[in-house]
Structure formats: structure tokens, C-alpha cells
Amino acid sequence: MRRCVWLVAFVAPIAVAALKADDSDRLLTIDHYVRVTSTVPAIAGQPAQLYVRERVLAGGALRSSSFGDRVVLFVHGAGTPAEVAFDVSYQDYSWMAFLARAGFDVFSVDMTGYGRSTRPAPMNDPCNLAKDRQAGFVPAPCAPSYAHTLTSIASDWNDVEAAVNYVRALRHVERVSLVAWSRGGPRAGGYAAQHPEKVRRLIVLAPAYDRSAAANAAEQTLGDGVPMNTQSRQDFDANWDRQVGCTDQYERAASNAVWTDMLASDPVGATWGPGVRRAPEMTGTWTPAMAKKLAVPFLMVSGAHDKQVAPDRVRELYADIASSEKVFVDLACSSHNAMWERNHLLLFRASLEWLTQGTVNGTKTGMLKLGYDAPRATQ
């Protein structure tokens, strides 16, 4: 288990010391940096830091033990860092801010290799991309300086553990709720299966799950191969547009805001060609055996038009998990990027009800449709 050192947090837009009574409804952004001894294969044993963002109402920021069961940690997926995925600076599209305004203390963590967390040095060399992805970054295709696994699912679980323990100590709570997206499903779900005593509730949008995954899937690594990838604006738009299945599903202005925040989260990638987002190639995943022992109350949401994590795969996860409290939501007019689309508030409100009451539309166990003509529940 990695060792953590808790550091001084930085607060924006106002200093905690200057808070006054009339500031209590102001929403704060607080940056935390958690020092760890890394277990990431590329930098194992070296000091590293994890970026943890906090959104909280100013009135609760100084009361370290006032939140009780209202402490949440967001965990991102394979490509987009947490502060972009869950706290995008566009209208009311920040999932973190939505929950914070409802009285939660809301945190997110960037895994090693993402956002403002430590990025292993090989990520700074475009030669470590696949040769067909190097164009525009180097004059001619080049051999990799590093062709091995950067991170692993096991090191991701250690990153989640470091963040969970940091938040538990900061807020004096035994358990936190986890909210994740996409490949954050294996990260958060796998962690919850291993540490149920530290997880109160689990919510995952588009949880990546493979019922046929090998029993040793959690131990799989890249070996020799391409350690990282990039995403350009063209890639980003094309992937989203192929998942549009209804009129006005998302706003171009929202897409622009997401991409602006994406480049801001990766200052080095922003200088490569027209600007790209860099990420490690994710290796390993959770296993069906882990899912079958997962007893934490679990809300899973699937966008009706998701072409990255097919809704049927999420239904398989619903069937496989052990929890007696589980809800599957089929979200209308939504893609893999549902939190940035027109039905985002349906998603956010469902998550709030799950966190506060353990139900969605009053349902504790079952399958629901949201955003269609009317919500319907089936067992």
C-alpha cells in the first residue's frame, strides 16, 4: 500500500481565512495535492503526487466533520481527466458543482498520468505514440524511447485508495461514496469490491464491463507496446458525433467548453500540433468475480446511444453484481458523454437521489427509463 503525505490545499476564488458569514453560499474550488510513493510500473517506488479537486459551499469548508455521509469522490475514465469530465466550466454542466450545491463535499482525483497529477516522463516523448499517431508531432516516424506499461489497473486502485484515505482523514468519515465514468467503472467498482468498508454508495455512468474477461484480467499489463495515446479535437468531435441519436442531443458550445478545459488540463499536449489530450494506455480491468462479490449499493446509468460501452454490457453488469440494492437507468437521448448533453440534469438528479435516499424515482432495485415519455420500473 502506498504511503500518503497530506499537503496544504490551495483555495479559489477566495481564501478560506477570509470567509465571512455572507460567503456561506459561495461555491469554492479547492486544489489538493496528495503525495504518494508510486506503484505505477513506469515510476514504481518514486515520489509522485495526485491532484484532488474539491467543490464545496464556503459555509462547510471549515467544518471538517460536518458532512457525515455526504462526502463523494469522482473517478475518471481512460482518457478525460476528472476536472474536465465532472467539473466542466459551462453553464450548469458541472456534476461536482451540482452535488456541492446540494450540500455535499465533493472531490475528484486524477490518476497518475492524467491532468495535474504526476505524468511519467515517457509521456513527454511523442516517439512513444503509435507510429501512425506521430504525424504532426515529429518530422518523421521514430522508435519509442519507452515501450512498456505506464500504469496498470492495480496502480489505479492504489491511486483511488490514496485519494479515499486522504478524503476520509480530511473529513473524519469512515466511508465515502464513489462516482465514476466509463473505464472509471473498473477503477471505482474494482476498488469498492476490494474495500467495501470504505465505500458507502457507488454510481457509474457507462461502466465498462466485460463478462468474458479472463480471471487474471486485473493482472494484465501492456508488456512491450505503445504506452500512451492522444486525442485531437477532430477525434473528440468524431467520436461524439457518431453517438448522436436524437435532435439537439448536445450543444456545440458545450463541446467547445469541454475541449477548452481538456487542453488546459494538459499544457504539454496543448503544444503538440494543433493541441491534443495525452493519456496512458489503460491496461487490465476488473473481473466478473469482482463484480459478483460487489455488495455496495450501485446505481449504473447507460446512455441510449452509447457506442463505447453498449447498454447491453451494462445490463450484464446489473445482472452479475451481488448487491441487493442496485438500479440500472436507461437514459434517453444520451451518449457516452451524457453529463455534457441535454439530459445531464436527469443524470445529476438521479445521482443525488441515490446518494441521499438510496433510490431513483423511489426505486431501490430495478431497471428504469429516464427521459422517455415517463419513468417506468421493472425488476
Predicted regions mapped to residue ranges:
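Conserved acidic catalytic loop of the alpha/beta-hydrolase fold
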Residues: Q134-A147, W157-R175
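N-terminal cap/lid segment of alpha/beta-hydrolase-fold proteins
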Residues: D22-F67
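Short glycine-enriched nucleophile-adjacent loop
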Residues: G185-P196, L202
